[in-house]
Structure formats: C-alpha cells, structure tokens
Amino acid sequence: MSLSSSVTKHLISASILAIVAMQLPSVHSVLSLNETNAYLHHICINGEGTFKSGSPYEKEIKQLIDFLSSFIKDYSFVHGVSGIGPDDINVKFQCRGDTLQAKCRSCLATAFSEIRSKCPNNKGRIIWYDNCHLDLSSIYTYGQIDYKNNFYMYNAKDVRGDKKSFYKNMKAFLHKLKAKASSKENKPYVKDYMYAAGRESLGTVKLYAMVQCTQDLSLKNCTVCLDWIMTKLPECCNGKQGGRVLSPSCNFRYELYPFVEN
C-alpha cells in the first residue's frame, strides 16, 4: 500500500462528521437517537467501475481502512489515498460531532463491513449511519462539494399549530448554527470542527438541531454546502416535526426532542 505525502498531512488534520450519499432524493420516516447508530442509506456508484473479489485492489482497500482506523483514537475525520491512476483508492470517513471515540471506531468497522456486503465490487460506494459515514471512491474529491448524491429523511409527525411560523423559526435556527459551524473562530483539528448543535425555544416547544460539514471542505465551501442543502427544506420537511438532509459533504437535522450528546 502506498500513501501519498499529502495523505499523511490530511490524516494529521483529521476531524468529525456524519454523511453518506445517494443519487436521487429518498423519503423515509425517522425517529432515531444517537445511541442507536441506525443505518440510514447507502449507494453503489456504478459509474466508477468494479473490481474482482480477492483481487489486489480489494486487499489494498482493506489495508487502507485498517491503517486509517488506527488514527481514530486521535481524530474523527480521516482521509487516505492509495494506488495510482484508474486503480486509485480514496477513502473519507467522518463521525458526527458528538460521537465518542469508541463509537466512532466501531462505526467505521460497521460501515466498512456493511458496504462490502451491499456494494461488494463497486469502486465507488457510500454508506451513512447516525454516527458516521464512509465514502470509498476511485476519484480524488478532497475539498470538493458533492452535489450529485443526497437524500432526505423526515419525522412522520406533523407540526401542531402555526406551521408557517414553525418553519420560519426552524430555518432561521439552522442558519444560525450554519454560521457557527463555518465561523473563522471554529478551530481546525478538533473533534467538533465544522459542527454545531443547539436548542431553541419556540413558544411551548423546544427545537433541537445540528449542522455539519466534512472537514476536508474550506469554511467557505462549508457555508456553500449548507446553504445548498437547506434549499431542500421545503421538499424534505415542510410541516414535519423533524427532518434531515444528507450529502457526502454536509448535512443538517432538526427534531422536537434531543438527539445529540451534550
């Protein structure tokens, strides 16, 4: 396995998040807590080609995953590259900002095991869990926003009372968290870099929300990515008590119950 010099640099600048991708919007009902680490979705990317089971390419992937796993004790975002040309292996893995180290490492093991089962021979494949997401690709995408692959989930319960007022206040709170996550005061190389979560009182109810970007993005691109997925709020979650939109580059979630660790 060969690792580029930039890979080591990226590993030392590791951090945290939870994302994974899908090519067409998908609607699900969700009522999940952080403790469950529920499987959310996966995608097998056919356009990047395939490899044979038992091939050197497959062995190289496992070696790279094992190598990156050892860094999770210090970081919750890891990125690695192995190979040259069409046989490139690019791995990005990130845990959600509130996920503890042990859960983060466990999530990587679970994600890698499941994606091998769901997309056994695809070079490009992504899987999302509540606590993490794993992105395997033959294309180098470090620092780039993925606009192609995204999906949404929503809480089956409808908002009671004034839905327009709720939507307006919820959207404003998400943008407030976006500003915090992408602020220059947000220090790189810490667990919750490019992550923000909080609680807001809306009359008699409390709104809980979080936003996060993958830590390979610049602060500017984090803002761009979150602005982009928030445009999907009307189709995702209008009138719902909770919802989320996820892409491989950023995501947000809101609920009327706590779902992140303090």
Curated annotation (Swiss-Prot):
Gene Ontology cellular component annotations, sorted alphabetically: extracellular region
PROSITE patterns associated with the record: GNK2 (PS51473)
Subcellular location(s) of the protein: Secreted
InterPro entries reported in the protein's UniProt record: CRR_secretory_protein, GNK2, GNK2_sf
Pfam families xrefs: Stress-antifung
Annotated signal peptide: 1-29
Domain Gnk2-homologous as annotated: residue spans: 39-141, 147-259
Keyword line: Repeat, Secreted, Signal
Homology family: Belongs to the cysteine-rich repeat secretory protein family.
Protein name in UniProt: Putative cysteine-rich repeat secretory protein 24
Annotated gene: CRRSP24
